């Protein structure tokens, strides 16, 4: 695994100094670049992020329902939110990518950026402990936690579309995967969404079937509200 430059600067940006800098190097390494890649750290970081944000929301909103808590958590930990955080940290400048990913602009790809954030969380946990992770994450999420509120704004596009159609006494939307491209670890899904009030199917594209369905549902809602 090639050493990554300027890691002390990244540590200052993250707000954490690693005792074992190799953990941070691994967290920034995509599987296209090395066998010592970040996917196991990503798995660990995903779980840690979920418990820290769940705990924060549970105590911040003592009267919120389970559904509202789940929707707020989903908003805060989903891939596009993590990708925004990655861009705030300029993680793309530090990623270790293979030649193919580098050439195709992998340092800008939201799924790779989001995965790197989760991997860094996992690396901090291994380098320190859960409480250190908690303190760090609450700092990263301070503004987002302050701004988030329970309610309809946290419902995802598929839920909003379903509720809209049910309220109009219309049939539920139908989703169909029409194309899957890419390697197993980095696929792109194309999904069509059909509703009775639109003559043509609406297409959504995403790094997972769920994300593609959400994208399609959001576009259907926009068309129905015109």
Swiss-Prot record:
Its EC number is 3.1.26.3. It is an enzyme of class 3 (hydrolase). GO terms for biological process: mRNA processing; regulation of gene expression; rRNA processing; tRNA processing. The keyword Cell wall biogenesis/degradation does not apply. The active site is at residues 46, 118. Homodimer. Digests double-stranded RNA. Involved in the processing of primary rRNA transcript to yield the immediate precursors to the large and small rRNAs (23S and 16S). Processes some mRNAs, and tRNAs when they are encoded in the rRNA operon. Processes pre-crRNA and tracrRNA of type II CRISPR loci if present in the organism. This is Ribonuclease 3. It comes from Shewanella amazonensis (strain ATCC BAA-1098 / SB2B). The lineage of its organism: Bacteria, Pseudomonadati, Pseudomonadota, Gammaproteobacteria, Alteromonadales.
């Amino acid at each position: 695994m090639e050493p990554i430059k300027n890691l002390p600067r990244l540590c200052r940006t993250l707000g954490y100094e690693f005792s074992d800098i190799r953990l941070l190097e691994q967290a920034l390494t995509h599987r296209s670049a090395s066998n010592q890649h970040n996917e196991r750290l990503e798995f660990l970081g995903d779980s840690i992020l979920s418990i820290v944000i769940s705990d924060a929301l549970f105590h911040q909103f003592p009267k919120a329902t389970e559904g509202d808590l789940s929707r707020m958590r989903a908003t805060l930990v989903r891939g596009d939110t993590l990708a925004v955080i990655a861009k705030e940290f300029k993680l793309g400048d530090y990623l270790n990518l293979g030649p193919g990913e580098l050439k195709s602009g992998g340092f800008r790809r939201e799924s790779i950026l989001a995965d790197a954030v989760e991997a860094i969380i996992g690396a901090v946990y291994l380098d320190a402990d859960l409480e250190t992770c908690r303190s760090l994450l609450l700092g990263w999420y301070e503004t987002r936690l302050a701004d988030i509120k329970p309610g309809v704004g946290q419902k995802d596009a598929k839920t909003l579309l379903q509720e809209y159609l049910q309220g109009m006494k219309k049939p539920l939307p139908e989703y169909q995967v029409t194309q899957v491209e890419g390697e197993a670890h980095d696929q792109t899904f194309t999904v069509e969404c059909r509703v009775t009030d639109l003559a043509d199917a609406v297409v959504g594209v995403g790094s997972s079937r769920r994300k593609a369905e959400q994208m399609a549902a959001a576009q259907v809602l926009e068309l129905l509200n015109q």
